[in-house]
């Protein structure tokens, strides 16, 4: 899986918004400055998040962006889907929708298993956990394994 800049920036912006203990809106300019996100790109990302119901915009001099849901109720998977679509796609389609001939049908099981593994992590990590820097044990256990930090190429060496 490739994590796009769009998903990474969206999560970084949401971490900044969720860290505001007073719930005050944060301007796009401030979000961009704090996380070094290009302004135009950030505006498009925030629009995607607004359409998905994750954030709301507040107009006016003290306006900006706020979460539209509790940060505990917004998962990493929700954010990725809001800005990039399905967690796993094959030729732009969900894996279960791809038709294979008999010899290659086994690939569908691989793609669906991969999506299931991604869901195990992405659906169980909330924006609140990211903002607080407190990841669930399922994530910290996986990252405690030294092999988790190695790319496939490095492990084969």
Where are these regions (language model features)?
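Beta-hairpin "wing" of winged helix-turn-helix
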Residues: 53-68
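Basic amphipathic alpha-helical segments that dock to polyanions
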Residues: 45-52
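Short coil turns linking two alpha-helices in DNA-binding domains
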Residues: 38-41
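C-terminal regulatory/oligomerization modules of transcriptional regulators
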Residues: 95-157
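The C-terminal cap of the DNA-recognition helix in HTH/winged-HTH DNA-binding domains
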Residues: 19-22, 33, 51
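Short amphipathic alpha-helical interface segments
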Residues: 10-22
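A short alpha-helical element within helix-turn-helix/winged-helix DNA-binding domains
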Residues: 26-36
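Conserved segment of winged-helix/HTH DNA-binding domains
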Residues: 71-96, 108, 112-115
